[in-house]
């Protein structure tokens, strides 16, 4: 505890968070890092059940208890202002996936039986495919904007996040939208009703809408200035 603010921390060995080890990204290191990330998230979510929290980035290491307390003292006002403004607000994650190739406009290469086409005919067909691709992408962006505007109406803040690559999602569908929404606890139920209505509408258009939460406010935290003498962040 540091006055009205408390820090939740655990002891780790600096050798476990060695930069070269993390940058090496061996299969064993990735499995270990995934386990650490899950544990890190679990602790933050447990703390968030009883109090507003300001999550620090995974891998933020304080070299001693004194350096941790010094960092808390240095950032006390920024942390206190954020926690007071946060109140009971919750972060919810919204992701949108393309269910099939119809709306993405993915283009295949020429088929084997197209080899007999003349050059002019090939260029004509290819041009038509490219125009269709642009139209599909425009339609997709229009749908994404419609989803975002509708869901943002009941939220305080929203933030777009880079969509995850297929290798990380483990899904056949391609993620085309990834965002975090922050809203008061009292507004969650009606907001989720809007999400479910929107999900049903999007599914008819070949899009899958996914919502998860509540989460700690990972994407809405202020940047804290912590000197190198107080901590090291990998």
Model-predicted segments: where are they?
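An interfacial alpha-helical scaffold signature
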Residues: 1-234
């Amino acid at each position: 505890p540091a006055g009205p603010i408390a820090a939740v921390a655990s002891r780790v060995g600096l050798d476990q968070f060695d930069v070269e080890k993390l940058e090496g990204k061996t299969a064993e290191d990735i499995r270990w890092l995934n386990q650490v990330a899950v544990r890190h998230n679990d602790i933050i979510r447990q703390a968030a059940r009883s109090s507003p929290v300001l999550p620090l980035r995974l891998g933020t290491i304080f070299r001693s208890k004194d350096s941790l307390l010094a960092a808390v003292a240095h950032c006390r006002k920024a942390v206190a202002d954020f926690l007071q403004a946060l109140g009971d607000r919750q972060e919810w994650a919204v992701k949108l996936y393309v269910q099939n190739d119809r709306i993405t406009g993915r283009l295949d290469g020429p088929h084997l039986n197209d080899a007999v086409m003349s050059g002019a005919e090939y260029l004509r067909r290819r041009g038509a495919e490219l125009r269709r691709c642009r139209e599909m992408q425009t339609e997709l962006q229009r749908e994404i904007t419609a989803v975002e505007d509708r869901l943002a109406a009941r939220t305080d803040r929203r933030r777009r996040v880079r969509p995850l690559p297929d290798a990380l999602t483990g899904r056949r569908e391609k993620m085309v939208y990834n965002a975090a929404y922050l809203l008061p606890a009292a507004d969650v139920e009606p907001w989720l009703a809007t999400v479910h209505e929107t999900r049903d509408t999007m599914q008819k258009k070949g899009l899958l809408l996914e919502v998860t939460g509540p989460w700690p406010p990972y994407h809405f935290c202020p940047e804290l200035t912590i000197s190198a003498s107080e901590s090291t962040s990998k």
